Design a protein with these regions (language model features):
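Conserved CoA-thioester-binding segment of acyl-CoA-metabolizing enzymes
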Residues: 1-60
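Terminal low-complexity tails and localization/encapsulation signals of metabolic enzymes
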Residues: 1-6, 260-273
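Structural motif
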Residues: 31, 116-117
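Glycine- (often His-adjacent) and acidic-residue-rich active-site loop
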Residues: 59-102, 121
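CoA-thioester-processing core
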Residues: 102-110, 116, 122-176, 189, ...
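C-terminal long alpha-helix characteristic of the crotonase
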Residues: 136-141, 192-240, 244-253, 269-273
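Acidic, divalent-metal-coordinating active-site segment for phosphoryl/phosphodiester hydrolysis
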Residues: 178-185
Length: 273
């Protein structure tokens, strides 16, 4: 399926990697209503496609994502209109709801999701990276919680994910000052798994995605689910969930393949069954 503002490509040894590119380079991939809608469609379709083992999200051109596009339409009401001159606040609320539904669809993906951050990454773009499971960034990347600079807190869940990744103090600094964080500082804080030169970004991201693609899909999905669902649980309750997941994978074909490949001293070929 073709889109106006999103490029999709299947890559990998089994074509199990869904490579998603935000494609508004002239706007630094700012998220318009159309881009939000098309991303949501991509994520929803990926969730029901068993052949997808990993999703990669990146940006075309020199930026990853400059946040939501507030240059026109109902989104403009959120930033530029005064209380007296606002004419389409209902449209602005609809825009925010569409944004939220797109990120809910992203979080619902049960396969690992990797952000490949090639440049500027602010506002809703940073939220997107925070909602991914892993991230690879180039040294050209810069990160910012931009909402506070506009007197807003129209955050798309970054307040939820960011403190869990980089820690409370760093997240609070970003959310209350709006200062840019460079690639090196962001990597040191734990926002990214790998930091490479711009020329190495795609290759390093592909290396990580291929490692994910080669893994056991059932075990990966259950592991991701447990990591998220058990946050806030007590230890014993979390172990109960883990026991259920262990029992499920123990009865799978992939478990048998893992055992055979170990005995035969070869790399396993997992099928997700």
């Amino acid at each position: 399926m073709s889109y106006e503002t999103v490029l999709t490509e299947r890559r990998g040894e089994t074509s199990g990697i869904l490579w998603v590119t935000l494609n508004r380079p002239e706007k630094l991939n700012a998220l318009s209503m159309t881009l939000f809608d098309e991303l949501r469609q991509v994520f929803q379709q990926a969730r029901t496609d068993r052949s997808v083992r990993c999703v990669v999200i990146t940006g075309a051109g020199r930026g990853f994502c400059a946040g939501a596009d507030f240059s026109g339409g109902p989104a403009k009401e959120l930033v530029y209109a005064s209380q007296e001159s606002a004419t389409d606040l209902e449209g602005a609320r609809l825009f925010f709801r569409n944004e939220s539904e797109t990120y809910i669809a992203l979080k619902r993906l049960d396969v690992p999701v990797i952000a490949s951050v090639n440049g500027v990454c602010v506002g809703a773009g940073l939220d997107m990276v925070a909602h991914c499971d892993m991230a690879v960034a180039s040294t050209a990347a810069r990160f910012q919680v931009a909402y506070v600079k506009r007197g807003l807190f129209a955050d798309l869940g970054g307040f939820y994910s960011l403190p869990r990744i980089i820690g409370w103090r760093k997240a609070m600094e970003m959310m209350t000052t709006g200062r840019f964080m460079g690639a090196e500082e962001a990597h040191a804080a734990g926002l990214t798994n790998y930091l490479v030169s711009p020329d190495e970004l795609e290759a390093k991201t592909m290396e990580l995605a291929l490692a994910v693609e080669a893994g056991p899909p059932l075990g990966q999905k259950l592991g991701k689910m447990l990591a998220y669902r058990t946050q806030g649980m007590d230890f014993e309750s979390a172990l109960e969930f883990s026991g259920i997941a262990l029992g499920t994978t123990a009865m799978s074909e992939d478990r048998n393949e893992g055992r055979r490949s170990f005995a035969e001293k070869r790399e396993p070929k997992f099928t997700g069954r």
